[in-house]
């Protein structure tokens, strides 16, 4: 049963578009968001909010 939940909600990495290499790790629901995830989050290396894109 646990295998089914990991397929539906895989662990993904959100990589900074500022080019710093900083990443966030999160889960997403494939049924609700089948496209690649793009979130605006804080990058502590450049000390500002930048877009983080899903890297598989």
UniProtKB/Swiss-Prot annotation:
<dbReference type="InterPro" id="IPR018264">
    <property type="entry name" value="Ribosomal_bL33_CS"/>
</dbReference>
<dbReference type="GO" id="GO:0022625">
    <property type="term" value="C:cytosolic large ribosomal subunit"/>
</dbReference>
<dbReference type="InterPro" id="IPR011332">
    <property type="entry name" value="Ribosomal_zn-bd"/>
</dbReference>
<dbReference type="Pfam" id="PF00471">
    <property type="entry name" value="Ribosomal_L33"/>
</dbReference>
<dbReference type="GO" id="GO:0006412">
    <property type="term" value="P:translation"/>
</dbReference>
<keyword id="KW-0687">Ribonucleoprotein</keyword>
<protein>
    <recommendedName>
        <fullName>Large ribosomal subunit protein bL33B</fullName>
    </recommendedName>
</protein>
<keyword id="KW-0689">Ribosomal protein</keyword>
<dbReference type="InterPro" id="IPR038584">
    <property type="entry name" value="Ribosomal_bL33_sf"/>
</dbReference>
<comment type="similarity">
    <text>Belongs to the bacterial ribosomal protein bL33 family.</text>
</comment>
<dbReference type="GO" id="GO:0003735">
    <property type="term" value="F:structural constituent of ribosome"/>
</dbReference>
<dbReference type="InterPro" id="IPR001705">
    <property type="entry name" value="Ribosomal_bL33"/>
</dbReference>
């Amino acid at each position: 049963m646990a295998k089914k939940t990991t397929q539906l909600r895989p662990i993904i990495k959100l990589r900074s578009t500022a080019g710093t290499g900083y990443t966030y790790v999160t889960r997403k629901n494939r049924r609700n968001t089948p496209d690649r995830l793009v979130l605006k989050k804080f990058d502590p290396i450049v000390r500002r909010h930048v877009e983080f894109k899903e890297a598989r």
